């Protein structure tokens, strides 16, 4: 057997053990502390579960603030007091890293998001059968999306509508949420009859009884999501421990449960 093949096999056996040891070391330092996390609104349910798991493992309290990635980016440039930033667009963390605001070598692409058209179960048009045509139906007077000026999921929605060739036809129907969670709330509350929202929200307990149609990933730029530890993090050890936890198999399984994909899969499929 070739030496190269043996070395590769040994590497894949050793790597999980190395990560486990590294995570254990960070978690030991994190015990009993508190971290402040700025998270994109598409993570509302997934991050809630991850935070609870981490708290049980380490005793570290995770205080999460949800919002739009673009707004957090502006706040962090002006010294907002967060330890970690989980963005729905990796370009924001990259810019923070380039500006020297991030802890060196902590930038991590943790997931790739997906978008769907979502309607309440009682909607007059069945989105699972009609897809894009749902948005053109006269029963749909308002379509909720996140504000594309500062929300990555809003930009993805606009790009997909343009790719589908219906943006001009539905532009007058669009209503903007401050972030993707607020856009979803507009549809849930009846203030819009349909919405283009994050799959991670559509599969949550609050929305899973509605109907959804997954927008093909090739119809919009990939929602590459990135995280990092801030250079001025008050509890850096705990922040690093949380970031390492997110890389674990347990955390990735939780993200997958909420519809998130991972960079290695999308690259393999040529969707990058």
Task: Show where each model-derived region lies.
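Bacterial N-terminal signal peptides
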Residues: 13-24
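Secretory targeting signals
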Residues: 1-5, 19-21
């Amino acid at each position: 057997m070739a030496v190269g093949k043996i070395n590769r096999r040994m590497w894949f056996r050793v790597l999980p053990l190395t990560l486990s040891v590294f995570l254990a070391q960070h978690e030991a330092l994190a015990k009993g502390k508190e971290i402040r996390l700025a998270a994109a609104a598409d993570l509302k349910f997934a991050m809630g579960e991850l935070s609870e798991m981490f708290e049980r493992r380490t005793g570290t309290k995770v205080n999460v603030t949800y919002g739009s990635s673009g707004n957090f980016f502006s706040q962090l440039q002006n010294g907002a007091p967060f330890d970690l930033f989980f963005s729905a667009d990796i370009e924001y963390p990259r810019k923070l890293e380039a500006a020297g605001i991030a802890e060196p070598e902590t930038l991590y692409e943790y997931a790739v998001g997906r978008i769907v058209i979502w309607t309440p179960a009682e909607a007059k048009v069945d989105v699972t059968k009609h897809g894009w045509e749902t948005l053109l139906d006269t029963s749909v007077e308002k379509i909720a999306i996140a504000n594309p000026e500062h929300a990555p999921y809003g930009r993805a929605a606009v790009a997909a509508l343009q790719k589908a060739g219906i943006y001009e036809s539905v532009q007058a129907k669009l209503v903007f949420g401050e972030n993707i969670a607020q856009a979803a709330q507009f549809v849930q509350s009846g203030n819009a009859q349909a919405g283009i929202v994050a799959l991670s929200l559509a599969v949550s307990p609050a929305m899973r009884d509605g109907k959804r149609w997954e927008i093909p990933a090739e119809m919009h730029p990939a929602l590459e999501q990135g995280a990092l530890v801030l250079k001025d993090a008050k509890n850096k050890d705990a922040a690093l421990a949380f970031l390492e936890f997110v890389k674990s198999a347990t955390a990735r399984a939780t993200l997958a449960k909420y519809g998130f994909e991972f960079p290695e899969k999308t690259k393999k499929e040529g969707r990058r």
